[in-house]
Each structure stands twice: as structure tokens, then as C-alpha cells.
């Protein structure tokens, strides 16, 4: 790394395939380990004696609230990180550091606002998200503690993106690994040894996130980081922040609309099939998040290379990086699809010993995940638009699958009378929306990608 210019020669000169996997593998590991935060909680909660199934469903109802917290971290960092990479490619490290400082202040401000909202309005929010009388107490126990750690979640997720943007993929992976490993240890200790149950799971999670947060801040303030977090840059600069928010709006909307999808599933299934179906969709969305995190790990490996070389005017390396990303994402989504189609009962059994809930989830999984094999195509194309700074197109594609297609299908299909089983109709909305979204996204991407990379070379 050239400290004066902020350029990393490897991003512009190293063999793309080797560089991609060097960045992607730690990012994938970090993303998959990050899933453990939620998966471990849900597995332990589902195995609580007597009330485990109800508690699992209750904690599932809190997931939209947790998604909102993560979405705001993405709004700031997923837009800020590509801009930092582009500025590194242009040799402007001072501007890149000012972006990091501005984004840090913004993350802290958002965290305080979200904490107040969650603490003051938890009950109506959880009711809106699909909590029933039976599941509300467990949902309230979890979110009332979890929301107190919002600032740790925001900073650990948000600032870690700036570590990845500099090419420090191993350090980025350790951020998540440290917290997840601690969570795995603390969960059974607080839940079963100390007898805290659901509250113990929430406390273990926020303490683990606090440790991850401390690790991230320490690294960015140290001399090991090429771009450093400096006190003088913490005052927000709106001229720098607004372009970051514009670019981060696409991943933000992806997560917010994922939240709307979760609420739509919860409310519709509660009406047509009851708490068992809501518990099943908790397991299904967790499984889908496993697929999503795998794919996002791949895109995080590609993004610094694509953004850097797009900023440097090297269209050939951008195209080569996308080719590797596309093949990798499609392969990854197909592997997850095969696992869910072949072993749905085993996947469901990981989360709960309850025979009724496990059997219902296995049945629903083959419907819900039917088109997940091709989902990698949409992620590769959509996130490449983000890496190339194409905010408007990326925002449209983020809205397409969930707001334009999936949510209306969830609400309409069980009411049209086409299917005898209303619950089947709700779950079937997912593969229909996935298929339509993949076709549209691929068509838009491949008609624009060549012009974008050619334009970079001529800039």
C-alpha cells in the first residue's frame, strides 16, 4: 500500500482470481459466522424445555426490528465503503478518511434514535410485526435487552465495512469471529446456567457485539489501518455524507424491504395458519439468510476490486472480477438450494425438537426455497451495480423483488382462492418473486454492464 496516495497496488495489478478469493474467503467466513449470532440464539431458544417452540416463534417476531438496526448500518457503511475504495483508487486518502469519520458520527446518532424508539414503543411495534398473545412476552424479553446494545451492533457492522474496503479482509473476518465465538460461549451460560432464558440470549448477543465493536474501533484508530478513524474527522460533512447515503440506499432498502417481507409473512401466516406457521417461517428466513450471507461474502470480496479498478479506469479487470463473482454466486446459491431440497427435515431439526414445528417447517421449506438456486444471479448483478456507483438502478432492483413482487404476492395469493391450502400459497409467493426478479435483474445488468466498463476505460 502506498500511504501517500492511498493506493493498494494489489487491487490494480494482482491476478484477479487469486485476489478475489483472498478477499472473498475471509469475508464469507465473517458473514457465515455473523449468521451464528442469530442461529445460535434460535437453536438454544428452540431447545428451552417446555416453552421452547413458543419462545422461538416469539424471538422470530423480533427479527424485523433487528433487521431495521442492521439496515441503518448498511445505509451508512454500504454506501461509504465503495466510495472509500474509489477514492483509494484515485489516490485521495484524506477524503477517504473524512468519509470514515462522518459515517462514524452518523452511525452513533442513528443508534441513539433507534434505541429510544425500541425502548418506548416495543409492544406496539412487536404487535405490528406479528406477535400474538402467546409469543409477545418472549419477543418483549428479547428486544428490550437487545435494543440497549444498538450502538454496538451499528458500529461493529458499519465500521467493519471500511476495514474490508481497505483490503484487510482477515481483520474484518476476525471482527465477526471474535463476537460470534463469544456469543456461542455466553448463550448457554446465561440461558441455562444462570436461568435467564430468552433474556440471557439477548444479553449474550449484545455483550458479544460490544467486544466486536471495541475490536473494530481499536483497529481503525491504530497505525495498522491505512485509512484511520481520527477525532478531527468525526464532525459530519454533509457534502461527503449525502453521496454515501445515496449509494447505501440500495442495500438499506434491501434490508428494510426484507423487514417488510418478514412482517407480511408473519401477519399473513398468523391469520391463515397460526403460530406454528410463524415459527416455521422463522426457521425458513434464517436458512435464507444463510444463503444471503454466503452471497454477500462473495460480493464483499469482489467490491473493492471492482470499485478500485472502476475508479482507476481499468474496465478489463472490472469485467474479469464480475465473471468470477457471477459463477461463484450462482454455485453458492445452488448448493444451498440442494441442501434444502434434499435434507429439509435435518435443517428444521437443528432449530427445534418439537415434532409438530419441525415437520411443518420441512414441508414448507421445499416450497419456500424452490427457486433459491438461481438467486445468486440477482445478488451478483445487483451488488455489482452498487460497486460501480450506479445507485438509482441498484435501488430499483432492491425494490423490485420484495416491494413490487413478493409482498403483493404474499398478501394476494392466499386470498385469490387458487390454492386449497392458504399457507402453501403464502410460501409459494417466495419462489415466484425470486424467478421474476432474477430474470429482470439479469436483463437490465447485461444491457448496461458493457457500456459502464467501456466508459471507465475512456474516462
Tell where the protein language model's regions lie, with residue ranges:
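Transmembrane helical elements of multi-pass membrane transporters/channels
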Residues: 22-41, 145, 179, 208-212, ...
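N-terminal transmembrane alpha-helices
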Residues: 11-51, 64-79, 83, 108-115, ...
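Helix-terminus/linker motif at the lipid-water interface of multi-pass membrane proteins
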Residues: 32, 36-57, 126-133, 189-196, ...
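Small-residue-rich hydrophobic transmembrane alpha-helices
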Residues: 56-116, 153-172, 280-338, 342-344, ...
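Alpha-helical transmembrane segments and their lipid-water interface positions
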Residues: 34, 38-45, 70-77, 81, ...
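Small-residue hotspots at the loop-to-helix junctions and early N-terminal turns
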Residues: 53-64, 139-143, 202, 273-290, ...
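Short alpha-helical transmembrane segments in multi-pass integral membrane proteins
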Residues: 1-26, 84-151, 193-249, 306-371, ...
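Short runs within selected transmembrane alpha-helices of multi-pass transporters and secretion channels
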Residues: 77, 146-164, 172-180, 201-214, ...
Amino acid at each position: 500500500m502506498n500511504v501517500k496516495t492511498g493506493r493498494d497496488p494489489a487491487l490494480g495489478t494482482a491476478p484477479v482470481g487469486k485476489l478475489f478469493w483472498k478477499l472473498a474467503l475471509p469475508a464469507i467466513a465473517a458473514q457465515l459466522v455473523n449468521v451464528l449470532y442469530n442461529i445460535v440464539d434460535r437453536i438454544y431458544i428452540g431447545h428451552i424445555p417446555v416453552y421452547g417452540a413458543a419462545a422461538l416463534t416469539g424471538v422470530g417476531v423480533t427479527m424485523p426490528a433487528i433487521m431495521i438496526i442492521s439496515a441503518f448500518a448498511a445505509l451508512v457503511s454500504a454506501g461509504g465503503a465503495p466510495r472509500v475504495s474509489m477514492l483509494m483508487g484515485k489516490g485521495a486518502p484524506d477524503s477517504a478518511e473524512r468519509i470514515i469519520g462522518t459515517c462514524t458520527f452518523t452511525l452513533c446518532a442513528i443508534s441513539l434514535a433507534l434505541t429510544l424508539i425500541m425502548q418506548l414503543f416495543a409492544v406496539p411495534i412487536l404487535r405490528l410485526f406479528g406477535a400474538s398473545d402467546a409469543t409477545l412476552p418472549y419477543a418483549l424479553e428479547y428486544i428490550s435487552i437487545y435494543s440497549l446494545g444498538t450502538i454496538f451492533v451499528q458500529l461493529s457492522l458499519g465500521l467493519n465495512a471500511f476495514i474490508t474496503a481497505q483490503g484487510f479482509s482477515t481483520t474484518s473476518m476476525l471482527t465477526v469471529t471474535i463476537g460470534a465465538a463469544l456469543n456461542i460461549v455466553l448463550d448457554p451460560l446465561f440461558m441455562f446456567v444462570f436461568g435467564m432464558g430468552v433474556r440471557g440470549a439477548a444479553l449474550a448477543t449484545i455483550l458479544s457485539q460490544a467486544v466486536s465493536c471495541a475490536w473494530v474501533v481499536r483497529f481503525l484508530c491504530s497505525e495498522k489501518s491505512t485509512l484511520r478513524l481520527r477525532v478531527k474527522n468525526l464532525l459530519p460533512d454533509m457534502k461527503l455524507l449525502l453521496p454515501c447515503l445515496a449509494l447505501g440506499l440500495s442495500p438499506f432498502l434491501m434490508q428494510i424491504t426484507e423487514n417488510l417481507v418478514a412482517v407480511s409473512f408473519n401477519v399473513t401466516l398468523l391469520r391463515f395458519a397460526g403460530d406454528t406457521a410463524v415459527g416455521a417461517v422463522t426457521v425458513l428466513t434464517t436458512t435464507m439468510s444463510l444463503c444471503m450471507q454466503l452471497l454477500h461474502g462473495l460480493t464483499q470480496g469482489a467490491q473493492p476490486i471492482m470499485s478500485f479498478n472502476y475508479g482507476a479506469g481499468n474496465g478489463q479487470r472490472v469485467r474479469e472480477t464480475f465473471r468470477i463473482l457471477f459463477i461463484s454466486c450462482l454455485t453458492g446459491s445452488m448448493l444451498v438450494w440442494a441442501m434444502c431440497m434434499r435434507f429439509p427435515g435435518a435443517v428444521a431439526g437443528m432449530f427445534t425438537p418439537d415434532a409438530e414445528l419441525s415437520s411443518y417447517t420441512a414441508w414448507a421449506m421445499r416450497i419456500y426455497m424452490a427457486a433459491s438456486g438461481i438467486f445468486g444471479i440477482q445478488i451478483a448483478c445487483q451488488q455489482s451495480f452498487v460497486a460501480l456507483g450506479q445507485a438509482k438502478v441498484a435501488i430499483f432492483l432492491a425494490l423490485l423483488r420484495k416491494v413490487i413482487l413478493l409482498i403483493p404476492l404474499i398478501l394476494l395469493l392466499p386470498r385469490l382462492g387458487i390454492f386449497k391450502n392458504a399457507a402453501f400459497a403464502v410460501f409459494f409467493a417466495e419462489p415466484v418473486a425470486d424467478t421474476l426478479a432474477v430474470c429482470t435483474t439479469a436483463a437490465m445488468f447485461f444491457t448496461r454492464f458493457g457500456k459502464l466498463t467501456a466508459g471507465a476505460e475512456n474516462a
